[in-house]
Amino acid sequence: MRNIHFDAVYHMPWLEYRHATPEGKVVLRLQTGRGDFSRVIAKVTSNYNYPDYFANAMQVEMKVAYRDEFHDWYECVFTPEDVRVKYLFVLESDEQIFKLDAAGLHFGADYYEDISEAFAFAYAYAAPAMPEWAKGCVGYQIFPDRFRREGENEPGLEPWTSDRVQNEFRYGGNLRGIIKAVPYLKELGVQMVYSTPMFLSDSSHRYNTFDYFRIDPLLGTEEDLRELCDELHKNGMKLIMDGVFNHSGVEFAPFKDAKEKGKDSKYYNWFFFDNTEECGYQTFGHWPYMPKLNLQNPDCAEYFLRVGRYWIEKCHIDGWRLDVSPEVWPDFWRQYRKMIKTANPEGIMIAECWDDSREWLTTGDMFDATMHYVLSRNIWNRFCHHRISLAQFDSCLNRSLMLYPERINQVLWTFLGSHDTARLRTRAGGDLRMLHAASFFQFTFPGAPIIYYGDELGMQGGDDPYCRFPMEWHNVEGNVTHAHYRKLAHVRAGSSALRVGSFRTWQVEENGLYAYLRQSDDQQVLCLINTALEPVSGIIRLPEEMAGAAVLTDLYADVPYPVQDGMLKVTLAVGEGVILTLPE
């Protein structure tokens, strides 16, 4: 008889465990101890199916979708006969049967199935659909001052190839430079561009905004931004702007007025003048040059709603990445979402959140996705710092996938470097092989992989400000890392399994060989990657759909891999990965 971990059995009618899809199907998930049960069934009925209720209930088999060291997460997807759903779970282990409902876990097949104690999905409203373009798209982050300079040099600029960097330095990157780089981005395989702030400021990062309705003249004009949007759209790309609405700069006119006039200013309550900090007002990160905004104030909230709407309507941007999202009044984000979806139904709203983001994502009334720092840290810890085993890495991945519905997992921004973090190659100790391995995984995992400008060239740099050196345009031609990223982006664009398919751990080897399955409605691919610092070999048991083939094709290198008796022998060099599929 198995030793069942009863305290691991868990289900709550919250969105990560129970939700509807945009197509109106229902997804149920159940947590159990790893390997504790041989079969799990969801019994589903209608809240109005009286008097029989569960006597003629739909019985839906559940399968293990995700697994970590200690847990299995079962999942089923079905179309309900009635959108007013009641359900419970039947769990089998050897000859023992248990039932789980809202009252708890019960022993025995004969336990009375009480409709009043069943879990309730009061009304299975279809979830809001994500913009199709955002699902699995390849993004590219630009820091405007450091990306590309076009036109006459402004006086006082730091030389582009300078070997020193500080946030107060200006290098003169501008919007005309980004426009000039559109063909480069298209050739690389970019489908969406995200730019850090562009508004008037006295810093190179522009997170201390002075005027939210004015493009910084060092970058260009509103007309330049409109032209950039038009050029990106003509070439099949989107533009996401950075909105800094948690705080402003000290030269923001309402803040200046409030600081000068005190309580006599109509803007006084746009900020927090409460002397909790030495400067006399609340700030972001205890930096006095970034006073915190009070978006609970209706006038302040309305101002920033107008800001968001203005740039969508005037320049046709495709959405906003919102800075320091968790520190902003949540009701403002609900208003902001309504504004975005009204101004541009295909627009997207991305949170900057460094932790578990369920509070901001699973309710469906705030953000579409977040910057997936939880995943980033797991990838860094395995591929760059080698702090965790492959088994631990796999467990972290499965737990992170369990946090959100699939429609959210498809659009989460997966990134390995940004303006706030050390560059990927630097994290990897300068080792291009591990940069290649980490980015291979990034591009073959669910979500929207984001390239930080210059990472595709193997640029180096530590934490802010050293991750913000100007783009090395002289290093593009013949760059093997650039070719690697370009290949990954184009393979991903042509593969529905990689863009929107499910993820399933397939094989985890102690030597660092990792196999995982990606599957969409019309394609299955098996990804193999060497996560170790030395070559690895192994024998991979192939999935049923591939086991009968004589040969499999690697989409990355376009080479054949022979199959023998449903098995595949493979040796991978450091940093190497393959994307296997049936030959056409």
Predicted regions and their residues:
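Substrate-binding/active-site clefts of carbohydrate-active enzymes
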Residues: C137-G139, F143-Q191, M198-K314, Y336-N344, ...
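Conserved, mostly hydrophobic/aromatic
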Residues: L30, I142, L185, S195, ...
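The feature marks proteins involved in alpha-glucan
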Residues: M1-K25, R29, N49-G139, R149-V165, ...
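Active-site-proximal helices and loops of the catalytic beta/alpha 8
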Residues: C229-M237, F252-K259, E313, D323-R407, ...
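Aromatic/acidic polysaccharide-binding cleft in carbohydrate-active enzymes
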Residues: D145, T363-G364, D368, Q410-L432, ...
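C-terminal beta-strand-rich structural cap/linker in extracellular carbohydrate-active enzymes
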Residues: R34, Q564-E584
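Beta-strand-rich binding/interaction modules
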Residues: F37-N49, Y53, Y87, P535-A557
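Carbohydrate-binding surface patches
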Residues: L15-Y17, V26-R29, W506-E545
